[in-house]
Each structure stands twice: as structure tokens, then as C-alpha cells.
């Protein structure tokens, strides 16, 4: 999880610990000792300059000089402690990752990297120093993330409860266009009559799921109030529906057939003709099969490709089946025992080369040999299907919300703890007096 972010450059520079030495001055001195580190007067002066520039650009008022200096000093002390935590944990940010972060900063602020360099220079901050400060900020953030995450415990019940609340809030604004068939239990009906009616409702539901026209079925069989409109109830929110309808609708999507379900007057079948305002998450799952040949000292890349091409020819000619070839040759024991089948999976679970194949291959077509980190493969897509993952997405959203809430709470507590446990000696405060903490 990224908990370090880069807003507008002016805001970013305000938040950063600017350990940048200004142009040489006659006297630079240690203002505070922080465990094994120090805060220099030049650090404070540079940070004060940055804060004032940012405030001026945004038209924000500032407190008096003494209060502002105290706030800046405290920020520098806490940042120094966090940097020391990162060093103790052995966190290092390499140049590749640093350059990626700098490019992200520029993009998020609609700048090129060159414009970002010009911006920092215009604020009196040498780009090289700014660059290293970003490196320190990322390292400190990683240390904070690692330490705080250990303190967070999210219970499954919390996720379920919040996910349910989010779903209810979403449902409150959702509109459904529904159609209805009612099979009425007549007065004086015997138990046999009721059972026959239930069987008829089940048969109708099955026919509808197989594609029968709902309006035709409603005209023919329904005894409900909208039978002469083909069962069409139009657009409604759940709160506007009869309770027996609303109780059955739990987030189903367009064209869903619901039922049959029983009420005091008989059996009911619903169809959701359309939905407005419902956030659904569908993913494509692929059932593929493959044959894997691993390279070794006795099996070269060329040899693996030749073997797989021979297997393809034998399968296409009808001499062999894919299943038999997978059992005989595949070096993926898990799938080989299942005729090479991998079962329904989302493509993202596979390595990039395999993912590309199962996403792009037409169903029933065997791929040419291709290489992954595991070896050489041929693959065939047997089936694709769309799977509703709305519930899972809602739970993931609930988990992220809980994580962010608890992270912010625990991060504040953690910062207070490391600040309290650090040795901090302010050598001269605003009154010129020494202060030990």
C-alpha cells in the first residue's frame, strides 16, 4: 500500500524534510540533537523559506515567526526520527525506483521532469538535494508503513458489516425495471392443487432462464395486476416496490430471473429487465489447458519447440488427443494429471506470456509454442465465462476503507510513541535556553 503521496508541488515541498544547506553562511549551528542525528539552523532556515513561498503562492496566512519556527523545528525532529527508523530497518531506495517516483510527481502535477527541476530551482532548492530528499521521504514512509501495519488488526466481522452498509447505501439509489408473473392459489385449493401450481411455477422459471419471452409468459399465465401489460412494473427503487419483491432483490444484475417464491396469494417470478445506478464488477474467467516442456542440459529451447510442434501436428491430424499428449509429455504435474486442464481462473493469475495467450487465443485453437519462466508451452482455451465479483469487490472496498482509517489512527499514535522515546535535546529554543527531552 502506498501511503506516501505527492500532491501539488507547493504542498509537497511544505511536507518534506528539507535537509538542504542554503548558500554558505557565516555561522551554521546545531539546533537540536535527535538520537544519533542533528537538526541544523540551515535546515530550519531552508524549511521556513519553503513554507513562506508556499503560503504566499496560495494566499494563506501564517502564524508569527516564533510559532512558525517552533512548528518547523518539530516537523524536522519527527522527520529525522523517521529517517533513522528507515536506516535501522535497512530500507534503501535505489535510483531506478527514485526516478520512477520523481516522474510520478511530475505527472501528477502536469509537469515534465524538466519542469519539475525548474520549479524546485525557482524555489531556491537545488534539484540534487530535492532528489535525495525524495529518496529519504520514500524510505521513511516505507518504515512507517511496515511498523504501523503490524499494529493493525481488521476482523472479518468488521469487513462484513461495513460491506453490508456500503451495499445498502448503494442500493438506496438503484432503480430496477422489473417484470412479474403471479400464479394465484385459488380459494379452496387442495394440497395437490398447490403442489401442481408450484411445479408449474418451477417449469415456467426454467423456460424463462432458457430464453422464453417473459412478456408472452406473463400474458399467458400471470394472474398479477400487471398481467395485461406483459407483467411490466416499470422503473422502481426497492423502497417503492411491494415488500415481497424488494426482499428478493439483493443486487442481481440485468436480465436476472428470480424465483419462484411463495407469498400468501401464490407463487411469483420476477425478471430484472434493466438496472440504473448499480455498480457491478464482472471478471472474465478462462478455462485453459496446456502442455509444458522444461528446458535442461539435455533439452534445449530448440528441442522443446520441435517436440511441441510435433505434438501440435499429431493433435491436429487426429492421431493423438490433447489430453493424451498432456498426460504423456507435460512437465506440469498438477495439470498433466487432469488432461492439461487448469480450470477456470482469471488471466491475471498467470505469468505475463501465458496471460497474453489465454486472453487472445480464440476458443478451441491451439497456440504456437511460447516460452515463459517455467519453460515452453502450448495452450488451448476451452471456455470463457463472465463471473460477477460485485460482492467480493464490495468487501475489498470495505477492507481498504477500514485499513485507511486504522492506518491513519495508528500512524499518529506510532509517531507520538517514537517521538516520546527518542532522545531530543534542543540546544537553543526561541528564548535562547537549552531544553532536554
From Swiss-Prot:
Annotated source species: Aliivibrio fischeri (strain ATCC 700601 / ES114) (Vibrio fischeri)
GO molecular function per UniProt: peptide binding; peptidyl-prolyl cis-trans isomerase activity; unfolded protein binding
Residues making up the signal peptide according to the UniProt record: 1-22
GO-annotated biological processes: Gram-negative-bacterium-type cell outer membrane assembly; protein folding; protein stabilization
Location within or outside the cell: Periplasm
Protein name stated in the entry: Chaperone SurA
EC number, UniProt record: 5.2.1.8
Free-text note on domains in this protein's UniProt record: The PPIase activity resides only in the second parvulin domain. The N-terminal region and the C-terminal tail are necessary and sufficient for the chaperone activity of SurA. The PPIase activity is dispensable for SurA to function as a chaperone. The N-terminal region and the C-terminal tail are also required for porin recognition.
Amino acid at each position: 500500500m502506498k501511503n506516501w503521496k505527492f500532491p501539488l508541488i507547493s504542498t509537497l515541498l511544505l511536507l518534506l524534510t528539507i535537509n538542504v544547506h542554503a548558500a554558505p553562511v557565516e555561522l551554521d549551528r546545531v539546533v537540536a540533537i535527535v538520537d544519533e542525528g542533528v537538526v541544523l539552523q540551515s535546515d530550519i532556515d531552508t524549511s521556513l523559506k519553503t513554507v513562506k513561498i508556499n503560503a504566499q503562492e496560495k494566499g494563506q496566512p501564517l502564524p508569527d515567526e516564533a510559532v512558525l519556527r517552533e512548528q518547523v523545528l518539530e516537523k524536522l525532529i519527527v522527520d529525522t526520527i523517521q529517517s533513522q527508523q528507515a536506516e535501522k530497518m535497512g530500507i534503501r531506495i535505489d535510483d531506478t525506483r527514485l526516478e520512477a517516483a520523481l516522474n510520478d510527481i511530475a505527472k501528477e502535477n502536469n509537469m515534465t521532469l524538466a519542469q519539475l527541476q525548474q520549479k524546485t530551482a525557482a524555489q531556491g532548492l537545488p534539484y540534487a538535494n530535492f532528489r535525495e530528499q525524495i529518496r529519504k521521504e520514500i524510505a521513511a514512509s516505507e518504515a512507517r508503513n511496515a511498523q504501523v501495519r503490524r499494529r493493525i488488526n481488521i476482523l472479518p466481522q468488521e469487513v462484513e458489516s461495513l460491506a453490508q452498509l456500503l451495499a445498502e447505501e448503494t442500493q438506496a439509489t438503484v432503480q430496477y425495471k422489473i417484470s412479474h408473473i403471479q400464479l394465484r392459489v385459488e380459494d379452496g385449493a387442495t394440497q395437490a392443487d398447490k403442489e401442481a401450481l408450484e411445479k408449474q411455477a418451477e417449469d415456467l422459471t426454467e423456460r424463462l432462464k432458457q430464453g422464453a419471452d417473459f412478456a408472452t409468459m406473463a400474458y399467458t399465465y400471470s394472474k398479477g395486476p400487471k398481467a395485461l401489460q406483459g407483467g411490466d412494473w416499470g422503473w422502481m427503487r426497492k423502497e417503492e416496490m411491494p415488500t415481497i419483491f424488494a426482499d428478493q432483490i439483493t443486487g442481481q444484475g440485468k436480465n436476472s430471473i428470480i424465483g419462484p417464491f411463495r407469498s400468501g396469494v401464490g407463487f411469483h417470478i420476477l425478471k430484472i429487465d434493466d438496472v440504473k445506478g448499480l455498480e457491478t464488477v464482472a471478471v472474465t474467467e478462462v478455462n485453459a489447458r496446456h502442455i509444458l516442456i522444461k528446458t535442461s542440459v539435455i533439452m534445449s529451447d530448440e528441442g522443446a519447440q520441435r517436440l511441441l510442434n510435433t505434438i501440435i501436428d499429431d493433435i491436429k491430424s487426429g492421431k493423438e488427443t490433447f489430453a493424451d499428449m498432456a498426460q504423456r509429455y507435460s512437465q506440469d504435474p498438477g495439470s498433466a494429471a487432469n488432461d492439461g486442464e487448469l480450470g477456470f481462473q482469471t488471466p491475471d493469475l498467470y505469468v505475463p506470456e501465458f496471460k497474453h495467450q489465454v486472453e487472445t487465443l480464440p476458443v478451441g485453437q491451439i497456440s504456437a509454442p511460447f516460452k515463459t519462466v517455467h519453460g515452453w508451452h502450448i495452450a488451448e482455451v476451452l471456455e470463457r465465462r463472465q463471473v460477477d465479483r460485485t460482492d467480493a469487490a464490495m468487501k475489498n472496498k470495505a477492507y481498504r476503507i477500514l485499513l485507511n482509517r486504522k492506518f491513519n489512527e495508528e500512524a499518529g499514535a506510532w509517531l507520538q510513541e517514537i517521538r516520546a522515546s527518542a532522545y531530543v535535546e534542543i540546544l537553543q529554543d526561541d528564548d535562547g535556553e537549552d531544553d532536554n527531552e
